[in-house]
């Protein structure tokens, strides 16, 4: 809100000497009126009433930060695992343990020849940790194969084909956005609005576009697009809120809405800026919440759509083929102890507000501060209080998009990595369900395993280099004429390697078998032969990309451990086109690693280089792979999915709306000066300025106020103001009106 002014000196500073192109037309800051009277005048609440408010009447709902050092005050009856669920979990964990022990014993046989050295012991330890990770994923996939093949009833049955159920509760649809393309955001929102309206239950839903946008031009463009959306839909249930204080990012955005409007609703469905959901699916989720009062959250499995580049098509195909197997297996043994992915999920507001308020973590960034990966933690806190959390992979009609290139994916992965490593501070939270702790550990492990795999490769290479170049120093205790040379059994090592690769590849084959056993799915993919070709091609390209991702994730972990914060960058979407210089700069590291590994391996022997060729080749090809996979595909080819062959109605509608020519935007101030309706709506949406006499100084507002006094035209303002000052102007009705009263042209 405009009254929540930052402390003097916080945030990006204003360069008082640099007036840039407007320096000749505008005087410098020296001598400008920075008096308190001038600032008070700028902060005076002068507003113009809009034709229709951007927001409904507030209905506050208390949401306080929870305590991590004290167990929740559970007033609900605890959900206990039944015998069936215990057996399911024993299957997963006993199977994981047996596979790990068998593989570990095989690896011990490989290195024990001639005695186990320190490096060999380290290699064995790393192998056990990594194999346990692979085996755990394999067992969940095996469970998913059993569930899908036998078509077992899910833990939370939702009828996805019968008549639409009757719903009576009120649900808020929340779409947070941060510097996204307003035209595309509104296209998706309108497509979902129309889809729900077609069900006949449109009156039960209110829609909130929750903007954390910091770019002034995008902010005003959002308001303009929102007014057009309201005009097109006639929607009295469409609302827009811009938050000037971006505290806690997305989780803070949602929490702000809950505390202001949450009491008016029973549920909320949280979306991402790239989310799409069918109205039929949304109504069925609401009905499931109504008939399951013990449930706090139902998470759908979003299907990837609108993939246009090779990289995004790979993700779309893999997610569509392998995703159902993995999520079905997880849901089978998670039951009501599931997880939350942050979007495309329905949440009971009473449970969320009471239990999921997030505290700030102690310490400095990147480990301290606001919790970035909030979704896992929010689910764990609600589960701690006795609420059930369900994953429903069988529910269709939930969609999302993915980054279009390897570098965009790595950028998002960097933020997720920091958020997941923050969970190390959440793990000791008192009262968490053990499955919730496992979810947190799994998220941490998904990034920590990358440096562990790299370390495993390096230790293996060191053992080979040591045996080849360095005199042995491994003497047994007591007198001996001969040293203990590092030795391995190469034949057994090949078998252990093959078995490990089998655990990685077999889930893909199981997913393929499930798919071709379902006639509807097989037809949607245009035949089993085409799917098999896609599986083979996806596995090949993914194997080439995996070493590069290993290096990028290792770099991310190292940066976080060194205290480097990821910040909050805008998610790049669209066609995935990359500047060659950016690709060379960001993928030079993996390429150099591949060169070093290949030289070291070849210095030992050609067979060792061939043994390491899958890793070395992927690293050496990082740059061409980064470029090639970011190219657009004219046809889906073997990576076609049912959503490409026959796009769902809501996806078609969103794409149709997005393809329409957007309204031309002239820049924030010029657009407001030309559009009285937009100006009235913008002024009316602003919160009243604070009337307090003393307090922190808003530096951008202060400098903007001083500069306005020396500007004689709108052109002067546009030339001299930076984005922080422009944003301060847009948040201050009086100062904005003063600027818009200036003539358009500059001084002669």
From Swiss-Prot:
InterPro entries: Glucans_biosynth_gluTrFase_H, Glyco_trans_2-like, Glycosyltr_2/OpgH_subfam, Nucleotide-diphossugar_trans. The keyword Transferase applies. Gene3D superfamilies: Spore Coat Polysaccharide Biosynthesis Protein SpsA, Chain A. Disulfide bonds: none annotated. The lineage of its organism: Bacteria, Pseudomonadati, Pseudomonadota, Alphaproteobacteria, Hyphomicrobiales. It is found in: Cell inner membrane. Keywords: Cell inner membrane, Cell membrane, Glycosyltransferase, Membrane, Transferase, Transmembrane, Transmembrane helix. GO terms for cellular component: plasma membrane. Involved in the biosynthesis of osmoregulated periplasmic glucans (OPGs). It is a multi-pass membrane protein. One of its GO terms (molecular function) is hexosyltransferase activity. It comes from Bradyrhizobium diazoefficiens (strain JCM 10833 / BCRC 13528 / IAM 13628 / NBRC 14792 / USDA 110). The chain crosses the membrane at residues 85-107, 127-149, 443-465, 494-516, 529-551, 587-606, 608-630. GO terms for biological process: glucan biosynthetic process. It is an enzyme of class 2 (transferase). Its EC number is 2.4.1.-. This is Glucans biosynthesis glucosyltransferase H. Belongs to the glycosyltransferase 2 family. OpgH subfamily. Pathway: Glycan metabolism; osmoregulated periplasmic glucan (OPG) biosynthesis.
């Amino acid at each position: 809100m405009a009254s929540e002014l930052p402390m003097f000196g916080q945030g990006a500073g204003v360069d008082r000497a640099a007036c840039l192109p407007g320096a000749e037309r505008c005087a410098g800051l020296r001598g400008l009126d920075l008096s308190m009277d001038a600032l008070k005048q700028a902060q005076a609440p002068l507003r113009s009433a809009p034709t229709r408010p951007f927001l409904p009447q507030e209905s506050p709902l208390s949401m306080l930060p929870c305590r991590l050092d004290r167990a929740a005050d559970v007033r609900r009856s605890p959900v206990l695992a039944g015998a069936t669920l215990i057996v399911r979990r024993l299957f997963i964990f006993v199977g994981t343990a047996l596979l790990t022990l068998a593989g570990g014993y095989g690896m011990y046989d490989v290195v024990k020849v001639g005695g186990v050295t320190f490096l060999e012991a380290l290699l064995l330890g790393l192998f056990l940790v990594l194999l346990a990770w692979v085996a755990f994923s394999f067992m969940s996939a095996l469970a998913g194969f059993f569930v899908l093949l036998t078509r077992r009833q899910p833990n939370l049955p939702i009828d996805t084909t019968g008549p639409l159920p009757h719903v009576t509760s009120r649900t808020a649809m929340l779409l947070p956005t941060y510097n996204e393309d307003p035209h595309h955001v509104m296209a998706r929102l309108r497509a979902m609005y129309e889809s729900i309206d077609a069900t006949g239950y449109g009156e039960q839903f209110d829609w909130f576009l929750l903007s954390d946008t910091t770019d002034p031009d995008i902010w005003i463009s959002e308001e303009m697009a929102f007014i057009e959306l309201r005009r097109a839909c006639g929607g009295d249930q469409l609302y827009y809120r811009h938050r000037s204080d971006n505290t806690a990012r997305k989780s803070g955005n949602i929490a702000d809405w809950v505390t202001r409007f949450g009491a008016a609703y029973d549920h909320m469905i949280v979306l991402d800026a790239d989310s799409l959901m069918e109205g039929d699916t949304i109504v069925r989720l609401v009905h499931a919440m109504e008939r399951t009062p013990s449930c706090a959250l139902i998470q759908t499995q979003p299907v990837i759509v609108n993939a246009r580049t090779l990289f995004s098509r790979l993700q779309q195909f893999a997610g569509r083929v392998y995703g159902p197997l993995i999520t079905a297996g997880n849901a089978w043994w998670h039951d009501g102890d599931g997880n939350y992915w942050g979007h495309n999920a329905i949440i009971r507001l009473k449970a969320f507000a009471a239990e999921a308020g997030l505290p700030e973590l102690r310490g400095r960034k990147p480990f301290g501060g606001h919790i970035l990966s909030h979704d896992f933690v929010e689910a764990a806190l609600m589960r701690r209080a006795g609420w059930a959390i369900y994953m429903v992979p069988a529910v269709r009609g939930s969609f999302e998009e993915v980054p279009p290139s390897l570098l965009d994916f790595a950028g998002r992965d960097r933020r997720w990595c920091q958020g997941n490593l923050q969970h190390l501070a959440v793990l000791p939270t008192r009262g968490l369900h053990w499955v919730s702790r496992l979810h947190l550990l799994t998220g941490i492990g998904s990034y920590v395993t990358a440096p562990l795999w790299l370390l495993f490769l390096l230790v293996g290479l060191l053992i080979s280099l040591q045996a080849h170049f360095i005199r042995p120093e491994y003497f047994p205790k007591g007198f001996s004429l001969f040293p203990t040379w590092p030795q391995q059994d190469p034949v057994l090592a090949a078998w252990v390697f093959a078995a490990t690769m089998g655990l990685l590849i077999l889930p893909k084959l199981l997913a393929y078998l499930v798919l071709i056993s379902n006639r509807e799915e097989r037809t949607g993919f245009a035949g089993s032969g085409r799917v098999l070709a896609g599986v083979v091609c996806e596995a090949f390209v993914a194997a080439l990309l995996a070493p590069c991702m290993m290096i990028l994730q290792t770099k991310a972990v190292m940066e976080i451990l060194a205290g480097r914060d990821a910040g909050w960058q805008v998610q790049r979407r669209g066609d995935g086109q990359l500047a060659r210089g950016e690709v060379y700069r960001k993928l030079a590291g993996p390429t150099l690693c591949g060169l070093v590994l290949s030289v070291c391996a070849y210095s030992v022997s050609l067979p060792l280089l061939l043994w390491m060729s899958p890793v070395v080749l992927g690293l050496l090809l990082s740059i061409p792979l980064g470029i090639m996979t970011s190219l657009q595909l004219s046809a889906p080819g073997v990576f076609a999915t049912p959503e490409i062959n026959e796009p769902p109605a809501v996806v078609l509608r969103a794409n149709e709306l997005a393809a329409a020519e957007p309204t031309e935007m002239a820049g924030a101030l010029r657009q407001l000066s030309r559009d009285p309706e937009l100006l009235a709506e913008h002024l009316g949406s602003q919160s009243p300025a604070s009337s307090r006499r003393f307090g922190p100084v808003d530096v951008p507002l202060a400098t903007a106020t001083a500069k306005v006094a020396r500007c004689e035209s709108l052109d002067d303002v546009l030339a001299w103001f930076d984005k922080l000052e422009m944003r301060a102007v847009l948040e201050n009705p009086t100062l904005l009106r003063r600027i818009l009263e200036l003539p358009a042209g500059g001084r002669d």
